Amino acid sequence: MKRDFMENWKTNLYRFLGPYAAFLLVMWFSSMNMTNFNEFSDIVSGTFFSVLFFGGSFTASYVLETMNTQQKRISFLMLPATSFEKFLARFLYVTIGFVVLSTVALLLAEVTRFLLLPLFDLPETFKQSTLPRVWQTIMNFRTFDFNGSGVMESVVGWLFFIWIHSFFLLGGCRWYNHAFWKTLGLMLL
């Protein structure tokens, strides 16, 4: 895992800057036209879910990107670990790693928003953090509207997210080159 971080530092930097830029741009443009902080927090929460869904699907499809050339395949297969350990390391790297990366990007975008807040004439309510509202939205995540308990709706929402994520993870295991587009094309058929 350490080898992946060191060899792919530029790719990891780009995968961090993408969510950071998305959060920062959404916070910037939505705060210019908003007067209600709750609407602003809902937009930031929606952006967080969108980044997790689309970015998570994209990174999951590159679970075995270390095997996209023959030389990289040989190098990866020669590592002193079992196949399960290698896959588990890559799985954690692209799933849990991306969630942590997105959360850190959201935190840094929030800090950047606080640093740039004195430059703009915004209402006093915007001088509070959106992170508690984002956390509350994460805990109450619902994709379907059906009669039942709120906990069950939240579980169904997260299971839907994991189900879609697993398709892209499976596509990343099947195809080494252009796995995201091939998996997306197969899902759309």
What is each model feature region?
Residues 1-74, 83-189:
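Hydrophobic alpha-helical transmembrane segments of membrane proteins
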